[in-house]
Amino acid sequence: GYSSAASDVYKRQIDMYGSVEAWEKSYVDDGSSSWARSAYYQMLADGYSDAEARKGTNWYDEIVQTGKIQDHQISLVGGGEKATYSVSLGYTNREGTIQNSYFKRYSLRTNTTYNPNKYFTMGQNTNLAAMETGGESGRQGDANTFAKTYTMNSWVPIYNVGGDYTGSVAPNAGRDISAVHQVAMNENDWTRMFHGQTAVFAELSNPWIEGLKLRSQFSARLNGMWSLEMTERQNMANKEASANNTLTETGNWRLNWQWTNTATYTKKIHEDHNITVVLGTEAIKQGVGRYMQGTRIDYIFESDPNTWTLDNGSSSNIGNSSRYQRKVTMFGLFGRADYSYKGKYLATFTIRRDASSKFGSKNRWGNFPSASLGWRMSDEKFMEPTRKWLDDFKLRAGYGTTCLLYTSPSQRD
């Protein structure tokens, strides 16, 4: 394993200082509302020195950090004449360059094969990973935390005299939510994910006919995501406070699987002719799963994540939704024939016959043939002078049909 650090790479910063004089002239205390008063004059009134009141805020420095990176792996590899195995455990912990942002991952990988005799082979490979992210989630545009460091003017302090986060204390002062405020709001939000995929196979080689190989493989992928986000009550300068907080909890899972069976026959005739024929079937199903989301408001202890459950919110305003994932199924038959003469003259012919739930009901099945011819010119005698610098040169021409599956099953008709 190893540990390192990732510092921010944004070395060129916009210098937003030196504007406090214009700010002083633009704002005076009208006495109508304490939260609308100029922070500069408020600080003077509260006993701060003129230098302290003029200091301003470097929003960029207030939200960045040097992120530590840890990456550790343990592997075990072994085997014998009839079996092999490998197992790997991994742990990753990466802090972001924005405070309170991070990425964690726990992973497991296994790979095993078993050969009880010269005809039969079976095996599996599995990858599992549990991940968690927190803090800044990569928002776009002005909503991004980095963007807020240069859309809020530097003469705006982090807090007003009442201890609340400042925002747009003036029409041209910047965003209503500062970068520091957003970092604080993201502190306890998280998203957790699970990714798992596995493939198992069995293979027979030369069971009855020399050159025949039978193979069956089943693979599956399971993905899950859970997230928890609290939108706190907000008290900001020059902006009406929000009356309620909101907890949003989201979860979904999705399963895809694929089953492929092939029979492959290879034959060499008189050392010059090589033939390979593949016949197979394939079944695919995607989108087995479900999505759910629930929201509630009015949490008494919004800063304590131990109380963040939907049951602890107000029952007077409940939001929820759920849906099944879109399912897509496909079944196909396919064949392929490859021929080569002395490795120089090549021909390939393929045919697929597929049925899909994305096809219209009147055209459930489709046929998709293709053919290609190739010539490996580098093996010709007239190419011998070029072999010192050009060892493989091949021309290939082909024609075929393919299918574009629509992005949504609802578009099939």
Can you say where each PLM-predicted feature lies in the sequence?
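Surface-exposed loop/turn segments flanking beta-strands in extracellular/periplasmic regions
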Residues: 17-54, 143-182, 233-246, 289-320, ...
